[in-house]
Amino acid sequence: MSQIDKASRRQKIKDRSRAAVAGTAVKPRLCIYRSLSQIYAQLIDDSGSTTILAVSSMSKENKELKGAGVEVCRTVGRQLGEKAMAKGITTVVFDRNGFRYHGRVKALADGAREAGLIF
């Protein structure tokens, strides 16, 4: 499968899932982006088009962590969950952004659940 086919396939999946997933101020959307070397997660209020909270493997508190392996992703998920709970957010809508729910994406979701987020 060529790179163009992979990109267009992911875009189709992303568009299809975004049609069904929307976040509000009470129940924001947990959006994940996974690159080859890093992982990013943010809570988004789609009704106000604002980012409520963002955490990544490149954040200041994650300087000692190397790369974006499964354990790093689990740590990022825990940090996101803890910060969300501190802001009073307990439930979210999970948006995997066209990525498979496997490996690093699953680890981030599990870390967020460990911190107390419900989705």
Swiss-Prot record:
SUPFAM superfamilies: Translational machinery components (SSF53137)
One Pfam family it belongs to: Ribosomal_L18p
Any one GO molecular function term: structural constituent of ribosome
Coiled-coil parts of chain: none
Superkingdom of origin: Bacteria
Keyword RNA-binding: yes
InterPro entries, per database record: Ribosomal_uL18_bac-type (IPR004389), Ribosomal_uL18_bac/euk (IPR005484)
Tagged with keyword Plastid: no
Keywords: Ribonucleoprotein, Ribosomal protein, RNA-binding, rRNA-binding
Any single biological process term in GO: translation
GO cellular component: cytosolic large ribosomal subunit
Subunit composition and interactions: Part of the 50S ribosomal subunit; part of the 5S rRNA/L5/L18/L25 subcomplex. Contacts the 5S and 23S rRNAs.
Role played: This is one of the proteins that bind and probably mediate the attachment of the 5S RNA into the large ribosomal subunit, where it forms part of the central protuberance.
HAMAP family on file: Ribosomal_uL18_B
Family: Belongs to the universal ribosomal protein uL18 family.
Protein name: Large ribosomal subunit protein uL18
